[in-house]
Amino acid sequence: MPKPTKGPRLGGSPSHQRLILSNLATQLFEHGRITTTESRARALRPHAEKLITKAKKGDLHNRREVLKTIRDKSVVHTLFTEIAPTFAERPGGYTRITKIGPRKGDNAPMAVIELVTEAYKPSAPKAKKAAPAATAPAPVEEAPAEETVAEETAVEEAPTELTDEASPEESVVTEEQPVEDEAATEEPAAESTEESTEDDKA
């Protein structure tokens, strides 16, 4: 069951509203932009965008459907040959409404409705790609840090236990031993890295 739109009609009767929207759409496609009241611009926007979508299909049936609304054949030709190809990649949003100051005579709110001329640039979903990249490096960096902390605590605990039991002269000797132990552990590590580089070359 057809139901009327909410709010007052443009012009009073349904036929007058259809004529107003038809004339506004014709002028919009002919000139590219028109200045009218905000309420007329808001009513024209979905009407004009449906006509552009039909023009994008470009077949005979849709041309006849557009000719029911826009009676000027030269404007329909312009719509199908010039305007519709510019919106081929754009999925919708062919028009833009910009509010301007009120009209001087009766203070009616005015607006400019125009066809969008900028090239369509689809936005890429950047948030989904950035999140996995940020989480991947984090575990790799934490693992070596925990190993070095564990080695340092083991080295620090060993001298403190020896100093409690030994005399001050012996503590000097025990402090030198961990340094020698660290040097001894570094030499095998260096040898293992040399062996791994030789294996990589082979």
UniProtKB/Swiss-Prot annotation:
Give the compositionally biased regions (Low complexity). Answer: 130-142
Q: Which Pfam families match?
A: Ribosomal_L17
Q: What are this entry's molecular-function GO terms? A: structural constituent of ribosome
- Residues annotated as region Disordered? 130-202
Keyword annotations: Ribonucleoprotein, Ribosomal protein
Q: Where is the composition biased (Acidic residues)?
A: 143-168, 177-202
Entry GO terms, CC: cytosolic large ribosomal subunit
Could you tell me the Gene Ontology terms of the biological process aspect for this record? translation
Is the Coiled coil keyword given for this protein? Answer: no
InterPro entries hit by this protein: Ribosomal_bL17, Ribosomal_bL17_CS, Ribosomal_bL17_sf
What family does the Swiss-Prot or TrEMBL record give for this protein?
Answer: Belongs to the bacterial ribosomal protein bL17 family.
**Subunit structure of this chain's protein:** Part of the 50S ribosomal subunit. Contacts protein L32.
Designated name of the protein: Large ribosomal subunit protein bL17
Q: What gene, per UniProt, encodes this protein?
A: rplQ
